[in-house]
């Protein structure tokens, strides 16, 4: 339940960041006027945006959920016998780590672009950068798929042990 709540929080924080990110009007690669962007002819300025804090919060939530989920599942690997589902669990865990890595990269870059970009310094190479539409939404989707993979691995890991316990109970009652 804890993992699910943190994953859900990361998803909604990413969606909120998508709607709060810095924006500018762009036509034919020329900035006409910006809601947030200020241009002095040779350098630009972007104030810090709420998407920065939302992105950091989403990053913390998805990281905590990933780490706690993997600790719970990996602890279960050492306590139980190896079964057929172990391979499937490992595949789900690897899938969750790949999704986690991509989600963390997108959230980190998106959040850092929404931090203050000062005149003459910018975000990278003295230029201001804006997060493209859909970056935070995609990272939210990846956060959800990461949590789904973790919960799936957990469900497949718990299910065989429950079946063994139920089988043992039925066997002792019949004797």
Curated annotation (Swiss-Prot):
- Keyword field contains Cell membrane: yes
What follows loss of this gene?
No visible phenotype. Double mutants lacking both MWL1 and MWL2 exhibit smaller rosettes with a decrease in rosette fresh weight and stem height associated with a reduction in total lignin content and an increase in syringyl/guaiacyl (S/G) monomer ratio.
Please tell me one Gene Ontology term that the record gives under cellular component: membrane
InterPro entries (UniProt xref): DEAL/Modifying_wall_lignin1/2 (IPR009606), DESIGUAL (IPR052222)
Q: Which residues form the signal peptide?
A: 1-24
Subcellular localization is given as: Cell membrane
Name used for this protein in its record:
Protein MODIFYING WALL LIGNIN-1
User: Which gene specifies this protein's sequence?
Assistant: MWL1
């Amino acid at each position: 339940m804890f993992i699910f709540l943190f994953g859900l929080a990361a998803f909604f924080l990413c969606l909120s960041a998508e709607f709060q990110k810095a924006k500018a009007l762009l036509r034919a690669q020329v900035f006409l006027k910006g809601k947030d962007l200020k241009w002095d002819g040779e350098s630009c300025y972007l104030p810090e945006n709420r998407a920065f804090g939302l992105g950091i919060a989403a990053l913390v939530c998805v990281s905590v959920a990933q780490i706690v989920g993997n600790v719970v599942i990996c602890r279960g690997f050492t306590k139980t016998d190896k079964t057929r589902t172990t391979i499937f669990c490992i595949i789900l865990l690897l899938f969750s780590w790949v999704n986690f890595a991509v989600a963390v990269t997108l959230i980190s870059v998106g959040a850092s672009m929404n931090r203050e970009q000062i005149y003459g310094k910018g975000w990278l190479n003295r230029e201001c950068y804006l997060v493209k539409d859909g970056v935070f939404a995609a990272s939210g989707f990846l956060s959800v798929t990461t949590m789904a993979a973790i919960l799936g691995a957990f469900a497949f890991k718990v299910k065989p042990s429950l079946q063994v316990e139920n089988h043992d109970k039925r066997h002792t009652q019949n004797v």
